[in-house]
Amino acid sequence: MSRVPLPDSFLRLPITHRALHDRAAGRIENSPAAIKAAVAAGYGIEVDLQLSKDGVPMVFHDEELDRLTDQTGAVNARAAAELGRIALKGSTDTVPTLAEVLTLIGGKVPLLIEIKDQSLVMGPTDGRLEAATAEVLKGYRGDVALMS
């Protein structure tokens, strides 16, 4: 694996954890509204990824939908299109894909992506989320870093 130096933008700007969320304002963590607010404020953004049933990186922190939506069950048990129709509690936003978030950010601020543990036991990974994330990031021109 090759490593490159962290871009300076990650050290100059505050990084918002799960974007600039504020439940009272209807900006739920990792939501499009929270992403837009962070970009408008000029802050970097950290988001979390889970893999959908059909292999699409989804911007969502938890393994289960229960805490942030009115649905139950695992994120990885549903297809991306279905997840994209599920509203986040207290918001009209739905669960976004990584590709949608990249479009919202458009390279304006740095993006720190956390690859969430897919084994749920902090064990070995099958590499599917990592590979799908790398594929979506191809051609993205903004500053981005990944962590797990």
Which residue ranges define each predicted feature?
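Phosphate-group recognition and catalysis centered on beta-loop-alpha active-site segments
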Residues: 1-148
